[in-house]
Amino acid sequence: LFKHQASGSILADAAHNACNLMVGHNHGNYSIEYTASSSHLYWGAYGGCLIDKDSYAFAYGKHSLRKPVIGCTVILDGRPLLVPMLLDKHGRWVGQL
């Protein structure tokens, strides 16, 4: 299931819907969490983002403790994989995966 935001805990949302859950929008969280019921393994993934944190549109996050994590999530054979964008000290892509 793909959602813009989780309804509470990402794992509780995944289990409630009886499926894995991929969530976007959460700029400061880029992670995968797992849980299991007696019959199924569930994962919930926060997908990172591809924003320009220095643009005016994202000025509201300047003082946030959690900064945006630039990257994407690939789902391969039903498993989520995090692919962070490697940046230099100026915040520019280094040209490598």
Tell me the role of every PLM-derived stretch.
Residues 85-97:
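C-terminal/domain-terminus segments
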Residues 1-87:
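Conserved beta-sheet core of the metallophosphoesterase superfamily
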